[in-house]
Amino acid sequence: MKDNFSFAATSRNITSSLPFVNLNMSGTNDLIFNCSHKPSDKHLEAIPVLYYLIFVIGFAVNIIVVSLFCCQKGPKKVSSIYIFNLAVADLLLLATLPLWATYYSYRYDWLFGPVMCKVFGSFLTLNMFASIFFITCMSVDRYQSVIYPFLSQRRNPWQASYVVPLVWCMACLSSLPTFYFRDVRTIEYLGVNACVMAFPPEKYAQWSAGIALMKNVLGFIIPLIFIATCYFGIRKHLLKTNSYGKNRITRDQVLKMAAAVVLAFIICWLPFHVLTFLDALSWMGIINSCEVMAVIDLALPFAILLGFTNSCVNPFLYCFVGNRFQQKLRSMFRVPITWLQGKRETMSCRKSSSLREMDTFVS
């Protein structure tokens, strides 16, 4: 028997811990159930267009990354293996966007059945975590390349063979709640069957708040600590070195790229996790304002969309900026790519060990 769900079950749905049930449930914040509101037509018309746009751009740039890796001859670097897995995770995440765009186009009416709801909901969550975890691995690997250049030069690809399965396993474990609870439920006053998180009614608020906080901790706080720590470690180390001329230019480029990784992660994911945290506070009864809850419900789809743009940005941060990117494309397509030509001479000078290792890491 399908339970009846309210609008909050849909607006926070794709990666957050909704919905809530219109039943008498112990331990819930009763105010939440009195704050029902319908989404505007403009709101629901804009979201699918933006989702398809992110899908097209992100899929294209990540396909290039995967193609470059597959066409690369000889042994693969540890950093290249991480970049490849990051691109795969982003591709799989982006591949689900057309379904969610359709979901919004039909006003939160899920047309693909309960099995697809569970599978694609879990698939999205799994690859979202995998993408974030691999970004964290890239930051740690980059830190090691700069701080311990001689040790990092002796890294073998087999070392990544341990890290990569571990990351995917962690992502799978993080998505287990979604796989277990994701299901189709009816929202009567909207006249739709929504793909939602069907938590146990008697512990609904606790589950909703707990899953939201888990996403905050595993998907943002812990990765940000690692990413930011690695950046400041790299910055401190490189600023201590006496670099002149072209070496100084390279050092500044490295620092800018390291800073760009941190800023991109914060800009893309902070809004979603702030709203998710506010959502958890509303379930715990700490936030008791219908206006705040309305903002959460209406803003979350756009915050999730902003998080997805990180999958479009990643190839530019980790692959396309390398000084051998043009060479790799030429090797793959065997045609000159004149539009990528630029001043590369600053990257060809003899560098210090840490700068040289850092430069090849993103190439």
Curated annotation (Swiss-Prot):
Angiotensin II binds at residues 103-104, 182, 204, 215, 279, 297. Keywords: Cell membrane, Disulfide bond, G-protein coupled receptor, Glycoprotein, Membrane, Phosphoprotein, Receptor, Transducer, Transmembrane, Transmembrane helix. Residues 71-80, 141-159, 233-257, 321-363 are cytoplasmic. The chain crosses the membrane at residues 46-70, 81-104, 115-140, 160-181, 207-232, 258-281, 295-320. GO terms for cellular component: external side of plasma membrane. It is a multi-pass membrane protein. Glycans are attached at residues 4, 13, 24, 34. One of its GO terms (biological process) is inflammatory response. One of its GO terms (molecular function) is C-C chemokine binding. Pfam families: 7tm_1 (PF00001). It is found in: Cell membrane. SUPFAM superfamilies: Family A G protein-coupled receptor-like. PROSITE patterns: G_PROTEIN_RECEP_F1_1 (PS00237), G_PROTEIN_RECEP_F1_2 (PS50262). It comes from the Eukaryota. Interacts with MTUS1. Belongs to the G-protein coupled receptor 1 family. This is Type-2 angiotensin II receptor. The lineage of its organism: Eukaryota, Metazoa, Chordata, Craniata, Vertebrata. The gene is AGTR2.
